[in-house]
Each structure stands twice: as structure tokens, then as C-alpha cells.
A protein has these predicted regions:
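Extracytoplasmic/secreted envelope proteins and their assembly/folding machinery
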Residues: 41, 48-54, 94, 123, ...
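Beta-strand/loop substructures that line and gate deep hydrophobic ligand-binding cavities in soluble
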Residues: 107-165, 170-172
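A generic structural signal for beta-strand entry/edge sites
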Residues: 4, 28, 103-105, 131-135
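Glycine-rich portal/gate segments that line the openings of hydrophobic small-molecule binding cavities
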Residues: 3-5, 42, 56-57, 65-115, ...
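Short, surface-exposed coil-to-beta transition loops
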Residues: 30-32, 91-95, 118-123
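Hydrophobic ligand-binding cavity/cleft-lining segments
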Residues: 2-74
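Solvent-exposed, acidic/flexible segments
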Residues: 37, 47, 90, 156, ...
């Protein structure tokens, strides 16, 4: 019986410790990654504007080639919604085009449903460096409420890594 009480006390102590840490952990994140693509700005922007193309380079989307996709609206314009349902790594959610500044940026809202509920925001911006060179900046931001914000200590690095891989895949596709 004493062993059970000791185990419960240790477990309770760990939980209390994590809850205290979460009090002092930031509630949101904003991650930015960029890459230079050897292709004209218009070619890059036209490709990015079509959310259906994101399956070709997005690290998360490529993790489950058999996921189910649904589309609502016209791709490449504000209001288009791309929804997916896949394995545990991909989960379930939808992405909606919220704003487009032609030749400059595409803003989307991502609404995750499974394995957890979360709303995030993504911005893809393009900048012409020369006639045949474009800088692409990918930004991702969201917030987590207490006590789930403690997860930010672990996931921020992983999100940044996935973003870098996605941009490298995008570069490979557009430089062919």
C-alpha cells in the first residue's frame, strides 16, 4: 500500500511541476523559414496560390499518400477550402485561403480537428530577387491555451524542421 501511495505522490508531483512550468511558458509561437528558388516570381507565386499543389511539397501532407482530400470553392481565390483526413501523423483538418496579395503573399487559416483542435495561420510570401530568382518566406503562427502551451517546448523545433523540408521540396519542384 505504501508503494502505491509513493507512486501516486510522485505522479502528482510531476503533474504539479508541469502545470507550474506551463504557467511560465509562452502561449504562442511564430516560426519563419525562407528559401531562394531559381525561378521567376510569377511561376513561383502561381504555383503557391493553388492549395492543391501544397500536397506536392508539404512535409505533413506527404506523410500519408492515401489521405482523403475534399475541396470547396475555386482553388487560388479567397475562400477556397482544402480539407483532409489521414493517418495519425496527418490527422484531420482544413485550410482556407483568407487573403491574397497578387505576386506577394497568400494567407491561410489552418483548422486542425484531429488529433487535437487548434487554429493556426500560415503566410507564404514571395519576393523577386532577379528575373529568375525568388525568395519564398513561409510563416506559421498559433497559440495554445494553458496548460497545453507546455507542448510548445517540444513542438516548435519540429514545426520549423517540417517547414524547412517543405520549402526544400518546393524548390526541387519549381527548379525542374
Amino acid at each position: 500500500m505504501n508503494i502505491l501511495i509513493d507512486i501516486l505522490l510522485v505522479l502528482a508531483s510531476v503533474i504539479v511541476f508541469l502545470l507550474i512550468v506551463a504557467l511560465f511558458t509562452k502561449k504562442g509561437y511564430s516560426i519563419h523559414r525562407e528559401i531562394i528558388i531559381n525561378a521567376p516570381l510569377q511561376k513561383v507565386f502561381d504555383y503557391l496560390k493553388q492549395l492543391k499543389n501544397w500536397d506536392n511539397f508539404n512535409e505533413r501532407a506527404t506523410a500519408d499518400p492515401s489521405k482523403k482530400n475534399k475541396f470547396r470553392g475555386t482553388d487560388g481565390i479567397v475562400g477556397f477550402i482544402y480539407a483532409w483526413s489521414g493517418n495519425k501523423k496527418v490527422g484531420e483538418g482544413e485550410k482556407e485561403i483568407k487573403a491574397i496579395v497578387e505576386g506577394k503573399s497568400i494567407e491561410t487559416e489552418i483548422r486542425f480537428i484531429k488529433p487535437f483542435t487548434l487554429t493556426g495561420y500560415t503566410n507564404m510570401s514571395t519576393e523577386s530577387l532577379s528575373d529568375n530568382q525568388t525568395k519564398v518566406t513561409l510563416s506559421n503562427a498559433s497559440t495554445l491555451k494553458y496548460p497545453l502551451n507546455i507542448l510548445l517546448l517540444m513542438v516548435e523545433k519540429g514545426i520549423g524542421k517540417d517547414m524547412s523540408i517543405s520549402l526544400s521540396c518546393l524548390k526541387n519542384i519549381l527548379e525542374k
